Amino acid sequence: MDYAPIIIGDQVNIAPKVEIYTASPHSITDHRLVARPITTIKDNVWIGCNVCILRGVTIGHNTIIGAGSVVTHDIPANVIAVGNPAHILCKLN
């Protein structure tokens, strides 16, 4: 498996059963990924129960990820994101 780093900022709240995937369990061992994308969760983020975060995404500052969401791409700062795939529900002031 190829593993990649995770960066978690300050004041990040992670609820139970959150999964953060950084590995690529590709069965063809001769074709490993050269780039190991970093998964980044910035400061003041709240991640609800049963959220799945895929490798290489960035979740911006002051963001809420709703329970059961699947984060497949970057989520900007100051938003609430929900769903599968996660999308912006609203912006926070």
Regions found by a protein language model. Name each.
Residues M1-T58, N84, L92-N93:
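Flexible, glycine/small-residue-enriched loop-and-beta-strand segment within the central core
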Residues P16, A67, A77:
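Residues that flank catalytic or metal-binding motifs in active/ligand-binding sites
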Residues Y21-T22, G66, T72-H73, L89-K91:
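Conserved acidic donor-binding loop of glycosyltransferase catalytic domains
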Residues W46, I64, I80-V82:
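Short-chain dehydrogenase/reductase
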Residues C49-H73:
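Beta-rich strand-turn-strand
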Residues I75, I80-N93:
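C-terminal end-helix/capping segment
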